[in-house]
Amino acid sequence: MEYLELNGTKEGLSAAVDDMWVLNATYLVFYMQAGFCMLEAGVVRAKNAKSIIMKSIIDTAIGSLLFWALGFGLAFGNADKASNPVIGTSHFFLINYQNLSFFAFQWAFCATSITIVSGSLAERVHVTSCLVYTIVMSAFIYPLSAHWVWSYNGWLRMIGFNGIIDFSGSIVVHIVGGCIGLVGTYLVGPRIGRFDSESGKPKPLPGHSITIYTLGAFIIWYGFYGFNTGSTLGISGGGIAIASRSAVTMTIIACASCATTLLAIKIKSGKYDVVKSVNSLLGGLVSSAAVCSLIDPWAAFIIGCVTSFVYLGCSHLLIKLRIDDPLDSSAIHLGCGIWGALSVGLFSTQENLSLVLKKSTNVYGLFFGGGFEQLGIQLLGIIIVMAWCFFCASILFTILKKFHLLRIEPTKELMGIDIDSAGGPAYQWDN
């Protein structure tokens, strides 16, 4: 933003406040990296805690540089012109780009999507594979998805009257990360000992610290208040009302999802399950990202309750298919992300949608009489983005597997990745 040109004017003050809002939201979104780091460290066994932290550092450091150099330009280059609807073609290395607060916010989103993948692949992949998928995701896969959905001239955004709507990234951030993680964990195979070799039944491989895991989840929840409210890109011109609604509905969705899971598991087994409840909470946050600004609080409660069963169903399906996802990242981010994106076409109200789009619209949620158009567009967008991610990830991880760069040797897996690749264990025990 060129503040010097607006200095001393009402527009200058408004622009400065809006950019400060976006920057503060960016700090919260970036703090989610600490949450994911703790979440992943807590769910793995102690012998792999240091390596999973190292992978989080790689995700952030390498991914950030690639997004600055290439990714942002591919995602948002020439976004203000009627140019290429498939890929951006300018602003690489931020050359001649002025709106740096927007770049910072989008960088934090990209970093979040990348870190989702490492949880799915935990405890059995080479550090090299983490480096490779981080480069490809930040420089190519994520940026094109973002361009199609979020760029002003992205082709999915231009379909129909409203275009696809993904307010804070259920599709662009979470479905992308969840899809790539699912492909990776399927191709790498389950951890040694996760399923019985004869019966195929799952065997528990509990993480070493439920305390760290839960702490990470609450840090992520805290960061989501920047993730969702910051997507207004300012508080002027009605932005504060949208942000307030987003914060409230997000909270209701997350809490309803968590509470439903708590009660459902208690009724079924007679006990509470901390991990499933925390995961359901995270699933609620993921579901809220697409729809939080477009719905009324009562609808948020319904969406949250349904999210619980979406998560539990997807988690159960992964086990049935013998897909070993240590963090249930695919169930949380892909499954709940799909539900959140579809909720836009079901529960968005005409008033809220018009406020967010800054134009009057007669296309809104099906349950409010807005017809099938928005739901159809949401479904199309989900299918397209998933197909893109599955295609790219399948090629990427197949190549890594062919050259023996995907999975570590069984002896090293049993010993723990920390000793082999991270310079020793995370915890030093006194003799």
Curated annotation (Swiss-Prot):
UniProtKB keywords: Ammonia transport, Cell membrane, Cytoplasmic vesicle, Endosome, Lysosome, Membrane, Transmembrane, Transmembrane helix, Transport, Vacuole
GO biological process: ammonium homeostasis; ammonium transmembrane transport; secretion
Segments on the Extracellular face: 1-19, 78-101, 151-162, 228-246, 296-300, 348-378
Membrane topology summary: Multi-pass membrane protein
Cell compartment(s), UniProt: Cell membrane; Endosome membrane; Lysosome membrane; Contractile vacuole membrane
Domain of life where this protein originates: Eukaryota
Classification via InterPro entries: Ammonium/urea_transptr (IPR029020), Ammonium_transpt (IPR001905), Ammonium_transpt_CS (IPR018047), NH4_transpt_AmtB-like_dom (IPR024041)
Residue numbers on the Cytoplasmic membrane side: 41-56, 123-129, 184-206, 268-276, 320-326, 400-431
PROSITE patterns found in the cross-reference section: AMMONIUM_TRANSP
Residues annotated as transmembrane: 20-40, 57-77, 102-122, 130-150, 163-183, 207-227, 247-267, 277-295, 301-319, 327-347, 379-399
UniProt keyword Protease, yes or no: no
The keyword Iron-sulfur belongs to this UniProt entry's keyword annotation: no
Cellular-component GO terms for this entry: contractile vacuolar membrane; endolysosome membrane; phagocytic vesicle membrane; plasma membrane
A GO MF label: ammonium channel activity
UniProt xrefs under Pfam families: Ammonium_transp
Role noted for this protein: Ammonium transporter that mediates the excretion of ammonium from the prestalk cells from the slug. Controls ammonium homeostasis during growth and development. Ammonium has been shown to function as a morphogen at multiple steps during the development.
Family label: Belongs to the ammonia transporter channel (TC 1.A.11.2) family.
Cited PANTHER family: AMMONIUM TRANSPORTER
NCBIfam families (alphabetical): amt
Protein known as: Ammonium transporter 2
Record gene name: amtB
